[in-house]
Amino acid sequence: MMKKIQRFGGAMMAPVLLFAFTGIVVGLASVFTNTQVVGKIAEQGTLWYNFWYVVAEGGWTVFRQMPLLFAIGLPISLATKTNARACLETFALYMTFNYFVSAILKVFYGIDAAKQIADGVTGYSAIAGVPTIDTSLFGGILIAALVVYIHNKYFDKK
C-alpha cells in the first residue's frame, strides 16, 4: 500500500513542476506592471504594460487550468503501459465529464453555468472553455485515477 501511495505522490510531481516557472513569470509580470515599482512606463495602455500583460496571461494558464493539467499529468506516471494513450483517454473522458455536467445542469436544473460564471457565482468554473461545476483539482485527479485504473486493468484484454 505504501508503494502505491508513493507512486501516486510521484505522479503528482509532473504537473506541480510547472508551478515554479509559471509562478516566476506571473511574479515578474506583476512587478513590471506595477507603477510604484517601474513608474509611468507601467501605466495601462503603454507598450510596456501591454507586453507584460500578455506575458502574465500566458503564465496564468497553468494556474487557471490546474484540474486539466492534473488529469492529463497523472497517467504519465501511473499508467503501466502506453502512458501517452492513457493521457489521451483521460483528456477525452475528463472533457466528456465536464460537457455532461454542463448539459445536466442546463437540461435538468435549468442552470446556465456560463451565466453563473459571468455573474461571479461561486461553485462554477470554465475548464478548457466548458462551463461546469467547479470540481477543482479533486475532479481532475478522480477522473485520472479512474481512467488509469481501467486502462491498467483492461488494456491487454482481448
Question: Where do the language-model regions lie?
Answer:
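Early transmembrane hairpin of solute transport permeases
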Residues: 2-158
